[in-house]
C-alpha cells in the first residue's frame, strides 16, 4: 500500500458568485430537463406580491432548494425530508425572490426514471387578511441554468472580475491551490 501523506492547509483564495456560472436564461418556470440540463443548479427569480402578514410558500423542489427573499435567506426545502413549504415574513412591497435548486443525483431505472429536477409544477404563496385566505401563483418567472461542469466553473471565474453581486449571499465557486511534493 502507498504511505499516507499530509499536505498543508488549503486556502480558498478565489471566489466567483453563482450567477457568474449562468449558462442560459429562459422566461417562465422550467425544469432542468426543459432547459436541457442533466446535472447542476437552477436559479429561479420572481417578484412576490406584497402581503401584510406572513405567508406560506409551497412548492415541490427536486431536490434541494434555498429560498432568498429581498436578498436574505429565509429557508430551505429538502426533498429527502419531504419539505414542501416554508414560512415567509410579511412583505410590505413587491419583493424579489431567488430560489436556488440543486439536483442531487439521478435514478435511471424503474418507476423513478422520470425523476425531473428543479421546481416541479406550480408554486403557491398563501396568506390571509381579516376576511379570507389568499392564494397567489406567481407567473413572471425567470429560469437560469448553472451546469455542474469544470468548464462552466472556469467561465464563472473569468466573468467574476466584472461582476457586481446585487444580493448578499456567498453561494458560488471557490478555488484554492496546493502543491504536493510527495505522492502518497
Regions found by a protein language model. Give the residues of each.
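Solvent-exposed, flexible loop/coil residues
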Residues: 36-39, 47
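Non-transmembrane functional regions of envelope-associated proteins
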Residues: 37, 68, 167
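An acidic-aromatic loop/edge-strand motif
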Residues: 1-9, 13-32, 92-183
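Non-catalytic terminal accessory/regulatory regions of metabolic enzymes
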Residues: 44, 61, 74, 115-118, ...
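Short solvent-exposed loop/turn micro-motifs enriched in small/polar/acidic residues
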Residues: 41, 58-60, 79-81, 171, ...
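A cross-kingdom feature marking solvent-exposed beta-strand/loop segments within repeated
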Residues: 24, 28-34, 43, 52-54, ...
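Conserved short histidine dyad/triad with adjacent acidic residue
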Residues: 45-51, 179
Amino acid at each position: 500500500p502507498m504511505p499516507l501523506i499530509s499536505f498543508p492547509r488549503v486556502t480558498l483564495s478565489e471566489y466567483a458568485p453563482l450567477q457568474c456560472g449562468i449558462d442560459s436564461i429562459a422566461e417562465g418556470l422550467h425544469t432542468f430537463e426543459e432547459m436541457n440540463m442533466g446535472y447542476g443548479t437552477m436559479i429561479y427569480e420572481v417578484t412576490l406580491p406584497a402581503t401584510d402578514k406572513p405567508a406560506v410558500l409551497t412548492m415541490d423542489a427536486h431536490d434541494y432548494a434555498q429560498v432568498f427573499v429581498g436578498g436574505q435567506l429565509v429557508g430551505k426545502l429538502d426533498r429527502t425530508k419531504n419539505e414542501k413549504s416554508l414560512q415567509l415574513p410579511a412583505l410590505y412591497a413587491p419583493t424579489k425572490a431567488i430560489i436556488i435548486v440543486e439536483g442531487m443525483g439521478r435514478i435511471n431505472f424503474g418507476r423513478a426514471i422520470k425523476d425531473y429536477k428543479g421546481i416541479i409544477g406550480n408554486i403557491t404563496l398563501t396568506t390571509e387578511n381579516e376576511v379570507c385566505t389568499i392564494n397567489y401563483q406567481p407567473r413572471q418567472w425567470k429560469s437560469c441554468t448553472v451546469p455542474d461542469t469544470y468548464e462552466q466553473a472556469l467561465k464563472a471565474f473569468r466573468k467574476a472580475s466584472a461582476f457586481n453581486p446585487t444580493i448578499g449571499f456567498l453561494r458560488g465557486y471557490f478555488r484554492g491551490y496546493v502543491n504536493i511534493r510527495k505522492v502518497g
